[in-house]
Amino acid sequence: QTLVVDLGQNLAGIPSVTFSSNAEGKLTLTFGEMCNETGDAERGEDGAAGTVYRANYRSAQTQVQIAMQDRQKETYTSTFFYTGFRYLSITTTADVTLSHIQGISVGLDSPETGSFTCDNEKLQRLYENTKWSQRNNFAWIASDCPQRDERLGWTGDLAVYSRTSLYQQDLYAFYAKWSRDLLDAQKEDGAYPDTVPYTITTGSGNAGWADAGIFVPYYIYEKYGDKKLLAATYSSMQAYMDYLQKKSDFAGGQIGAEATFGDWLGLQVSDATFLSALWYGADAYCMEKTAAVLQKQTDVAKYQKLHKKIQNYIYRTYEIAERLERTVEKDFSQTELCMLLQYDLLQENDREKAQQMLLASVEKNEYRLVTGFVGTGLILRSLTDAGGAQSAYRLLLSEKKPSWLYSVDQGATTIWERPDSYTEESGFSKDEMNSFDHYNNGCAMQWIYESILGIRVDLAGEQPITIAPVLPDETVALTEAAGSYHSIYGEIKVGWKMNDRNIRKEVNKSVDIRKKDNSGNGETVTEAEFTIEIPAGQTALVALPIVGFEPRKLPGGIWKFAGVLEQ
């Protein structure tokens, strides 16, 4: 006899089962993230309908076997392992009474620092899914997934997600430990590994993965302002930059780290060698900022010069100016454009061309998510910087396949590894690398904090606290949001709500206040209310998108504003 239990949440943890039996026998527990629906192998299913799907666990065929005795009641709680699962399959060889079945979540016991609520249920679910995937993978190390025969600390995942993670939890101690592991794992030639802690089955010096050693320490400083950790890793960061310099050929060859992964799992093809060069430029960009924080002026000049040298190489080798002039979307992938824009690798007169090309590409792809590991963490901010905040909203809230919300529509309770981990048309992905609990694509939550709420805390900048929410237009199904971030200065809170109806001039018919009224009777407008809380003793630069509101510095306290939204 077999019973399959849906716990309702994909979690990393252990099972606890209370049972009683009047006979000796065996109770077997088997785990799965999904269930087989039809038993059709053509849909990637590995068992009969209703059984747990196990193929994506690969060789980690996690199973618990309990020898039952003739006794009234017994509780089994695993103590020797944990795994990722939502479904628990319980098979017995003798009659048994199950009185309690529980999945006990295991994760990092670190205080949550971020919160977010909104009136879009699917976006809210995506936010909760991200928090769950972070909890499930941030335990002893920052693992990629909690279920299969891997569970490694892939650096590429952290390179794109670490900024988001720092909004969600107080992770200073966690990342301090990670930084020590990083230094321990660094190769003698200066290359950073693909995984931290390092395992002999993985490589090193690969673009987009090794670069976590440059970016993560700086991101930690952004949020905590503690130079000690940054200073402790600085010589290691320099060693990696020296490694890149030694292996780079600026005279017509390749520059940067190894082009092994490219834009991993991206549906739009990117040139992996080009991305390696862009990552090298990004590293120089970040090292310049790091050196400035540590007041190493000679190094600031050194990395400024290197950044310019890389920019010149990229322009020459990849014909950047010529390709931008053609304004053909297929000349650059979205990820390539995002990296050029975010790491200041474009000449000033080319920035707008690249931004327009990015906006056109996203629109042409009908707001589907086509970026991979590298680009997904950059796309929303890049669109917003390009004046395309509404495009960013449409991309984030798209339910087309592939998209962030497609998995939510399929009942996901965590973030999926692949855009096609499961589809209604084809079933499960045929690729065995198919986790349903991977935090990397949850990097969109950074944009929720920084743009929807408008909270930015950057202790490396001139203004540590900025509050500048970006509100959606009438095409976006979102009219209310609120949230907070508990920074080292205290808790910062932002809430906004767009009124259902507010008409500047009296009209004779009912109108949608989020659209223009062309009847001649008057103009319809949207009015919004904002509530902002700034920690006591601190000052925040506040910019609100309401008519007549000039950006201003406000002291600690609770502030309320209302007004007509800018068009």
Predicted regions and their residues:
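Flexible glycine/proline-enriched surface loops and loop-helix/loop-strand junctions
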Residues: 72, 141-148, 158-159, 265, ...
